[in-house]
């Protein structure tokens, strides 16, 4: 008996397995999904997602060929999952109570033996219960382990599905990306100008008296427009593909995170449960429980105390510990399963997101790789589609012609020459040779068949009157299609091999790539090889007819020499073929002259012919004597042998004839041919008439036979009909004997009625019917036996029926008694129900009053809560305002609040104060500024949660008091409470990350700045965050001010020293007031070289200087002094002009025009 195979349905979220026997009874996929939906309690069939092994989508046509199906709930793949749905999958179905301690540890036992024995038996029952719970927990643990393994298997399957989905798209993208990358790497839109200039330097050459310049084939405007188009759209294409590549890289990173999550979860499960062996613990528990039972069964008064101590101090504790371990393992497995189920939601969401991203990539790839007829080229600026990329490729190819045009032109020259040689030189020759050779072969066959018919045709006509008319096929080999004259850029130029050689040498002489020369030479060698191959084909075809002209002697000779000569040279075959063609033409000419010479009636010209010979000719018709050689000898290579054979035949048939002239012979031969044809036609006509008469006779005979057969068949049909009626009667008798087989007999009658249409098969069918009738009689006999058995069984059943009826009557009497009793009880219960309804109504009135009071209290509490929540909102906003003031104070001092690595810090930022002064104007108004810290935005986003608190007017009733609400207002309390509860949960519910902190606490802790902060300095006296930073800043500023004051004092002292030193030093340039200057007497250069006595003029005193020559001392006449040292009091500037150049007041020192001089007033020291 074959084993039953099952289809396993695995739930990916709770690990539950459902097994269905094969073949699956569901005919369609919708029915199968409906069954899964009902089994796993999923809302809708549309939420199901089914996969098979290796992440392949389910193909329901192969449902009986697969072993596992993995079920996923699509609702768990979304970004936000309903908590009730998560609870549905994480809800535990195992109900096991925690093991309790032994009752022996709790009881106070005296010295009575009876108490000991009863406590031991109670402990035995406790151990039995613990053991049963342990076995149940062991079973639950096995189920949990199986479910966890199923969840891991489902995670691997969905990951394989995502990997398969993304890999295919990524592979297509990589191929296309490499293609575009290659275009971008080899683009010519920037370097085509230099390539085109190099192409223009290529020299002009001549082919077929035509001067050709390669650069003329390219249009400069088209090249420029192509380059512009590529320059515009190629960066857009590359950027588009780079964006898609970044998306694919993010998808791969997300795949790695999912894979890492699965791997870490599996490693965690291995590390947590690899040392757990529940079966050993359970076996130990069962062994100890069995030992405890055995001890109680063998209990005696002598060893009761020892057994009691053993059970209390050792066995009971060990049993409890083992049960506790099993219970702990069960809880650990359940917690790990719930944790894995919740953590896998992120993996499912990641897989759904990456799948959507890859769908977007696939859509973009379809847009740029497949042509869309509805899309217009460059429909939008920056839009990249298939048309754009194909245009870039086309334009790049056109730009590449600036480099590859010499090579492509050379390929075109070689190809056109190859086609010319193939078509003109050889294809026509091959066609003509084939036609001629095939017609020659047909002529050989025609001659052979004519000679053979002359030899054996008359003898065969005696056996069969059908004429033997030889028919041979006609051969018409023609070359269809015109030669291509216009060959692309070469047009109708005639290309010679010398032109190709000259062109290759021209390229070799220029600065073109050496690879061009190599490729062109290789292509030219291929041209020569193609032409040589066509020559060989032509040689072979021209010698085809030689294989049908060999005589018998030639065949024997060739077979004899076959061992010595293994190969025949093609050139020799060609020569032999040409010779045979010449001989064939000679033979055809000779054959036309002496055609049918063997049938020439030479008997008339022989006088010595006797009657016996005539008698023999009547008895034996004239038969052409068989040729001594092969009939194809008429076309043999040696014409001399052919002539000898024909002359010997003529000599044997015409021993006494004279040599005739050729023209007379031809006429005579024509007459003979016509007479012979007439005789043949007459004989054929008589034969055909005889055949027609004989066939008419056969037709009449066959008609008579058909009538006779018809009569026979009618008689036979009558007989069969009689037999059929007899069989019908037999069938009716069979029907009367057994009504059970009436359906089969009706089928037989129908078959018999249908047999009227098959007259030729009636006899065979009747024999079959007789055999069936005999078999049916046997079956009827068997059925009669079964009927008798059934009748006996029916009698037994009737007896049983009577017994059951008697029992039923007695039961009915009992039921009537019970019914009466139940009616009485029902009346009593109805009375009690009425009393309970009255009590219930009274109770409902009381509860309604209490409920109304509770509703009023709830309303008051709601009002209190909303007031408190609004006060909390105001408090938080005011605290936030204080926080802003702190930040503004910090920034006014050059400090900035920042958050680095989840830690708040206050840093000194250079230039912050100047920036604030530039942006805000007056730094004195701190409150009007806006802080620059980015932490404020983060805290402001967190504190915006308090905006969800509704104002007092939005949630309180229109008129609220503590005891005068109407019923309609009371009905609104529930909605108000639900709104407050939802708002309260948003603010004060503990989050998952920190079980001990809600959102309001988090905001307050953040604004307190006590945790996750870094102080500016460690101080025992000051640990407040802002105060610590401000005090440190003040101390830094105070220290800086002290250092500056000290530095200023030192600099003032140095300044005094320098001033004192400078006051005692003589200045030599850059004269200013209070400078000490040395004046020396100097002379005045007169314009005419005259020297005026010094007594008449002022003696000039010039300042001793470096680079400042026109500083003169304003003083009276000083005599008997060689130098004067004075401190400058005032410096007056003057300038000599053309007006005052002669004035002694304005130009006392007679300086030149446009000279600037200074008059210095100084006190002599």
Curated annotation (Swiss-Prot):
Tell me, how does this one assemble?
Homodimer and potential homooligomers.
Identify the keywords attached in UniProt to this record, alphabetized: Autophagy, Coiled coil, Membrane, Protein transport, Transport
Q: What does this protein do?
A: Plays an essential role in both non-selective and selective autophagy such as mitophagy. Recruits mitochondria for their selective degradation via autophagy (mitophagy) during starvation, through its interaction with ATG32. Works as scaffold proteins that recruit ATG proteins to the pre-autophagosome (PAS), the site of vesicle/autophagosome formation. Required for ATG9 anterograde transport from the mitochondria to the PAS.
Example GO CC term: the record gives: Atg1/ULK1 kinase complex
Tell me its family.
Belongs to the ATG11 family.
- GO MF annotations for this entry? molecular adaptor activity; protein kinase binding
Q: What induces it?
A: Induced during biofilm formation.
Check the record and name the InterPro entries matching this protein. ATG11 (IPR040040), Atg11_C (IPR019460), ATG17-like_dom (IPR045326)
Q: Where is the signal peptide?
A: none
Where would you find this protein in the cell? Preautophagosomal structure membrane
Q: Spell out the coiled coil positions from the record.
A: 239-304, 670-853
Q: Which GO terms describe its biological process?
A: autophagosome assembly; autophagy of mitochondrion; cellular response to nitrogen starvation; DNA damage response; mitophagy; pexophagy; piecemeal microautophagy of the nucleus; protein transport
Q: What is this protein called?
A: Autophagy-related protein 11
Task: Give the membrane topology, semicolon-separated if more than one.
Answer: Peripheral membrane protein
Q: What happens when the gene is disrupted?
A: Impairs the transport and degradation of ATG8. Also suppresses the degradation of both LAP41 (the indicator of the cytoplasm-to-vacuole pathway) and CSP37 (the indicator of mitophagy).
A single Pfam family, by name? ATG11
């Amino acid at each position: 008996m074959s084993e039953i195979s099952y289809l396993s349905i695995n739930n990916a979220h709770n690990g539950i397995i459902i097994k269905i026997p094969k073949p699956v009874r569901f005919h369609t996929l919708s029915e199968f999904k409906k069954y899964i939906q009902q089994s796993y309690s999923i809302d809708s069939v549309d939420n199901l997602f089914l996969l098979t092994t290796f992440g392949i989508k389910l193909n329901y046509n192969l449902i009986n060929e697969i072993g596992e199906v993995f079920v996923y709930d699509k609702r768990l793949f979304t970004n936000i999952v309903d908590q009730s749905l998560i609870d549905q999958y994480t809800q535990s179905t195992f109900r096991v109570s925690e093991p309790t301690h032994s009752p022996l540890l709790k009881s106070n036992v005296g010295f009575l033996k009876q108490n000991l024995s009863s406590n031991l038996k109670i402990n035995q029952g406790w151990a039995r219960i613990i053991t049963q719970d342990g076995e149940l927990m062991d079973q639950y643990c096995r189920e949990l382990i199986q479910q966890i393994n199923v969840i891991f298997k489902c995670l691997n399957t969905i990951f394989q599905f995502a990997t398969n989905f993304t890999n295919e798209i990524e592979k297509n993208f990589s191929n296309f990306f490499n293609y575009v990358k290659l275009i971008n790497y080899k683009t010519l839109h920037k370097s085509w100008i230099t390539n085109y200039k190099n192409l223009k330097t290529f020299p002009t050459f001549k082919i077929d008296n035509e001067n050709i310049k390669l650069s003329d084939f390219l249009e400069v405007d088209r090249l420029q427009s192509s380059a512009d188009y590529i320059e515009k759209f190629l960066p857009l294409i590359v950027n588009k593909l780079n964006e898609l590549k970044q998306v694919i890289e993010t998808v791969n990173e997300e795949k790695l995170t999912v894979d890492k999550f699965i791997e870490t979860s599996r490693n965690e499960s291995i590390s947590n449960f690899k040392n757990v062996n529940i079966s050993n613990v359970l076996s130990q528990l069962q062994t100890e429980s069995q030992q405890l039972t055995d001890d109680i069964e063998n209990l005696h008064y002598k060893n009761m105390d020892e057994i009691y101590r053993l059970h209390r101090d050792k066995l009971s504790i060990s049993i409890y510990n083992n049960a506790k371990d099993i219970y702990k393992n069960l809880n650990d497995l359940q917690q790990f399963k719930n944790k894995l189920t919740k953590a896998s939601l992120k993996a499912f969401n990641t897989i759904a997101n990456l799948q959507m991203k890859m769908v977007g990539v696939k859509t973009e790839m379809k847009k740029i790789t497949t042509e869309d007829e509805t899309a217009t080229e460059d429909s939008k600026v920056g839009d990249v589609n298939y048309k754009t990329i194909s245009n870039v490729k086309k334009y790049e190819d056109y730009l590449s012609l600036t480099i590859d045009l010499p090579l492509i032109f050379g390929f075109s020259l070689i190809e056109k020459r190859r086609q010319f040689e193939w078509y003109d030189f050889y294809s026509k020759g091959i066609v003509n040779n084939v036609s001629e050779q095939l017609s020659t072969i047909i002529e050989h066959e025609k001659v052979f068949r004519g000679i053979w018919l002359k030899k054996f045709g008359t003898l065969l006509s005696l056996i069969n009157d059908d004429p033997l008319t030889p028919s041979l096929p006609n051969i018409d080999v023609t070359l269809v299609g015109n030669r291509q004259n216009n060959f692309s850029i070469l047009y109708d130029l005639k290309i010679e091999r010398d032109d190709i050689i000259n062109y290759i040498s021209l390229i070799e002489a220029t600065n073109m790539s050496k690879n061009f020369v190599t490729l062109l030479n290789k292509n030219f060698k291929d041209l020569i090889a193609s032409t040589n191959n066509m020559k060989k084909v032509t040689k072979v075809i021209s010698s085809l007819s030689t294989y049908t002209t060999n005589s018998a002697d030639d065949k024997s000779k060739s077979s004899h020499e076959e061992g010595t000569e293994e190969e025949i040279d093609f050139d020799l075959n060609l020569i032999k073929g040409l010779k045979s063609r010449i001989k064939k033409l000679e033979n055809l000419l000779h054959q036309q002259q002496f055609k049918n010479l063997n049938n020439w009636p030479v008997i008339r010209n022989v006088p010595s012919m006797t009657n016996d010979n005539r008698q023999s000719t009547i008895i034996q018709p004239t038969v052409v004597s068989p040729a001594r050689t092969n009939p194809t000898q008429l076309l043999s290579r040696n014409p001399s042998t052919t002539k000898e054979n024909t002359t010997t035949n003529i000599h044997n048939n015409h021993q006494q004839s004279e040599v005739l002239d050729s023209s007379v012979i031809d006429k005579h031969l024509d007459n003979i041919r016509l007479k012979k044809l007439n005789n043949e036609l007459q004989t054929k006509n008589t034969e055909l008439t005889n055949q027609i008469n004989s066939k008419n006779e056969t037709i009449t005979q066959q008609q008579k036979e058909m009538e006779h057969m018809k009569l026979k068949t009618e008689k036979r049909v009558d007989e069969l009909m009689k037999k059929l009626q007899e069989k019908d009667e037999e069938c009716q008798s069979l029907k009367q004997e057994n009504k059970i087989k009436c359906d089969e007999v009706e089928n037989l009658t129908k078959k018999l009625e249908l047999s009227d249409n098959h007259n030729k098969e009636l006899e065979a069918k009747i024999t079959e019917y007789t055999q069936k009738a005999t078999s049916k009689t046997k079956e009827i006999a068997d059925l009669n036996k079964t009927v008798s058995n059934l009748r006996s069984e029916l009698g037994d059943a009737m007896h049983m029926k009577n017994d059951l009826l008697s029992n039923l009557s007695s039961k009915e009497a009992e039921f009537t008694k019970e019914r009466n009793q139940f009616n009485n009880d029902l009346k009593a219960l109805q009375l009690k129900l009425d009393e309970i309804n009255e009590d219930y109504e009274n109770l409902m009135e009381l509860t309604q009053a209490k409920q109304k009071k509770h509703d009023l209290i709830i309303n008051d509490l709601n009002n209190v809560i909303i007031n408190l929540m609004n006060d909390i909102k105001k408090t938080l906003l005011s605290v936030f305002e204080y926080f802003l003031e702190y930040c503004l104070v910090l920034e006014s001092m050059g400090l900035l609040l920042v958050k680095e690595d989840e830690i708040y810090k206050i840093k000194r930022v250079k230039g912050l104060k100047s920036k604030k002064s530039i942006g805000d104007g007056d730094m004195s108004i701190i409150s009007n500024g806006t802080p620059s810290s980015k932490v404020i935005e983060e805290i402001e986003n967190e504190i915006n949660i308090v905006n969800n608190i509704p104002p007092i007017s939005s949630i309180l009733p229109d008129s609220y008091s503590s005891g005068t609400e109407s019923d309609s207002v009371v009905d609104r309390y529930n909605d108000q409470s639900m709104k407050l509860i939802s708002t309260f949960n948003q603010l004060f519910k503990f989050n998952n990350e920190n079980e001990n902190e809600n959102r309001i606490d988090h905001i307050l802790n953040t604004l307190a700045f006590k945790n996750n902060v870094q102080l500016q300095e460690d101080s025992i006296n000051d640990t407040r965050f802002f105060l610590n930073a401000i005090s440190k800043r003040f101390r830094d500023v105070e220290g800086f001010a002290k250092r500056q004051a000290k530095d200023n004092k030192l600099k003032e002292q140095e300044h005094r020293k320098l001033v004192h030193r400078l006051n005692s030093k003589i200045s030599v340039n850059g004269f200013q007031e209070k400078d000490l200057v040395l004046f020396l007497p100097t002379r005045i250069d007169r314009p005419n070289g005259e020297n005026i006595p010094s007594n008449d003029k002022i003696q000039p005193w010039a300042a001793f200087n470096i680079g400042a020559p026109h500083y003169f001392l304003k003083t009276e006449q000083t005599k008997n002094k060689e130098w004067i040292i004075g401190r400058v009091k005032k410096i007056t500037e003057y300038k000599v002009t053309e007006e005052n150049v002669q004035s002694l007041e304005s130009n006392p020192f007679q300086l030149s025009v446009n000279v600037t001089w200074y008059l210095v007033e100084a006190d002599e020291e």
